[in-house]
């Protein structure tokens, strides 16, 4: 047996994964709940504990099935800060704006394990659709000296990748 070191990806104990989604039709809106698991690498946790805020974005795209045409694209932005004087973690949700504090980072990540979306602005006819979702650490908001190393370090690869679920609407909204 021949083994070649370095050719297989290293096992990681961190990353973002999309577990499942739930959809509910309400009066004039499609409610989508994304269930995900977020685990930060040691480098990301160390940066956070040393005053670097982390920005996480969850994106949702509603598409017409088969055509690949995007009908609606929405995202939710989150910012995590460590507050050293109080030893608390602060989670800021950009839209709708809210700020919460938590005693441990695991509590912040548990809060982010469920992300809610409401797609209400555009009427949809009954039919076949797809919901595409991804979550990632948004590196565009990182301090400039950290951006280049983040592009090449495996410790900063926090991206679930796109995941697609089918959606069938029996009645329009």
For the regions a protein language model found, what residue spans apply to each?
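Intrinsic-disorder/low-complexity, polar/charged segments enriched in Ser/Thr/Lys/Arg/Asp/Glu/Gln
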Residues: 29-31, 55, 75, 114, ...
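Bacterial N-terminal signal peptides
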Residues: 1-6
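Signal that preferentially marks extracellular ectodomain short beta-strand elements
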Residues: 39, 43-45, 107-124
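N-terminal onset of structured domains
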Residues: 11-54
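A short, structured loop/turn motif at beta-sheet edges
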Residues: 23-30, 65, 83-87, 121-131
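Glycine-rich, aromatic-bearing surface loops/beta-hairpins
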Residues: 121-173
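Structured domain cores in non-transmembrane regions
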Residues: 43-111
